[in-house]
């Protein structure tokens, strides 16, 4: 009897020892995971639809991961073809609906328009050679070009000109997209996408969420324990309206959205890095002079370039005035209700320019590090 008792006690002791060891290992792993979690900078990308958020994520992959594999590049071919089809369909489809309407320079091209509208619009369209032929010929037509110039009067993807200029390349059977093609390619973001990368042994998790109005309800899921918000706005959208609501100016929507995020009670301690994006397109519009900023934002007529403005060599003074006016519209919101718990850090960006994003993100890293230290009360 005693023998059995001592064997049982010994077994219990062994079991306890194993259990303690297992608990110790679990606790050790929990502590390790906690350290990794606390050492990770979580960045939430917010902004209205088509502001350039997903392009910023692609740049992080190019700059800090391994870019895109040959297979991933080939997988983008279909999306790029869709962009070309969407662009030529939209432009030719709006020629007759504009006020005043626009006619083809060469009426003999009408059969090409009919093909685009009737055949290329079909769901199971497979991009035969004649599609590229018709698209290239139409894109050279001055009437089609004139309709493109009035793109702010209807909804057209930003990359339309970029890809329509490259149809002769995309149509090749051995075509492989370049990094610039992938950066320019427009695909609607639905849901939440996380990108992980490391810079100088510091871990970053970047969350990209859809910017269209019906996607924004998902944002709240990402607010927990965020280091910083990167708010992206398309500065070139000052003369455009929303896809979801043609009565609302896109830049005004972006300002309203920024205000709601800045004043959100759950985000009062999270600072915002403001990416004033699409500076290249803004400069083009201002220099062209067809869509005047003051026609959409009357205060611009009285606005003077601030003393803190940095002017790039050869930069048009009117472009400088425009970009700082838009910056100050956002800063008016952040300074009006700032309580010293969170700050707004503006940067002028061109999301398709890898060197620009490299420089801007390097400038932001110190800011993000300070936010991270403050988040865990180490500063």
UniProtKB/Swiss-Prot annotation:
Return the Gene3D superfamilies for the record: GI Alpha 1, domain 2-like, P-loop containing nucleotide triphosphate hydrolases
Q: Which residues form the G-alpha domain?
A: 39-379
**GO BP terms in the entry:** adenylate cyclase-activating dopamine receptor signaling pathway; sensory perception of chemical stimulus
Binding residues annotated for Mg(2+), in chain numbering: 54, 189
What GO cellular-component annotations does this UniProt entry give? cytoplasm; heterotrimeric G-protein complex
Indicate whether Lipoprotein appears among the record's keywords: yes
Lipid attachment points (S-palmitoyl cysteine) = 3
Instruction: Cite the PANTHER family for this sequence.
Output: G PROTEIN ALPHA S SUBUNIT, GTP-BINDING PROTEIN ALPHA SUBUNIT
Q: What is this protein called?
A: Guanine nucleotide-binding protein G(s) subunit alpha
What is the source species?
Homarus americanus
């Amino acid at each position: 009897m005693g023998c059995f008792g001592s064997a049982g006690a010994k077994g219990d002791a062994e079991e306890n020892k194993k259990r303690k060891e297992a608990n110790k290992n679990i606790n050790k792993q929990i502590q390790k995971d906690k350290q990794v979690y606390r050492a990770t900078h979580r960045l939430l990308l917010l902004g209205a639809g088509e502001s350039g958020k997903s392009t910023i994520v692609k740049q992080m992959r190019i700059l800090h991961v391994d870019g895109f594999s040959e297979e991933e590049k080939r997988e983008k071919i279909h999306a790029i073809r869709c962009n070309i089809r969407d662009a030529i369909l939209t432009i030719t489809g709006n020629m007759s609906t504009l006020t005043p309407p626009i006619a083809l320079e060469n009426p003999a091209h009408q059969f090409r328009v009919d093909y685009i509208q009737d055949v290329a619009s079909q769901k199971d369209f497979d991009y035969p050679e004649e599609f590229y032929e018709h698209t290239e010929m139409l894109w050279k037509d001055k009437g089609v070009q004139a309709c493109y110039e009035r793109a702010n009067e209807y909804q057209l993807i930003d990359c339309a000109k970029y890809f329509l200029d490259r149809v002769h390349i995309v149509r090749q059977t051995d075509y492989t997209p370049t990094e610039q093609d992938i950066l320019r390619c427009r695909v609607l973001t639905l849901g939440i996408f996380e990108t992980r990368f490391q810079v100088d042994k510091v871990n970053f998790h970047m969350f990209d969420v859809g910017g269209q109005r019906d996607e924004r309800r998902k944002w709240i899921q990402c607010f927990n324990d965020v280091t910083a918000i990167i708010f992206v706005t398309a500065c070139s959208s000052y003369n455009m309206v929303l896809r979801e609501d043609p009565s609302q100016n896109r830049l005004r929507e972006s300002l309203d959205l920024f205000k709601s995020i800045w004043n959100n009670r759950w985000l009062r301690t999270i600072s915002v890095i403001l990416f004033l994006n699409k500076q290249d397109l803004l400069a083009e519009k201002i220099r062209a002079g067809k869509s005047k900023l003051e026609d959409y934002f009357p205060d611009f007529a009285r606005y003077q370039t601030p003393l803190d403005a940095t002017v790039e060599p050869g930069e048009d003074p009117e472009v400088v005035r425009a970009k700082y006016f838009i910056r100050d519209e956002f800063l008016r919101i952040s300074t009006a209700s700032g309580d010293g718990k969170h700050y707004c850090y503006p940067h002028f960006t061109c999301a398709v320019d890898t060197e620009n994003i490299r420089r801007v993100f390097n400038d932001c890293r110190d800011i993000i590090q300070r936010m991270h230290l403050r988040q865990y009360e180490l500063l």
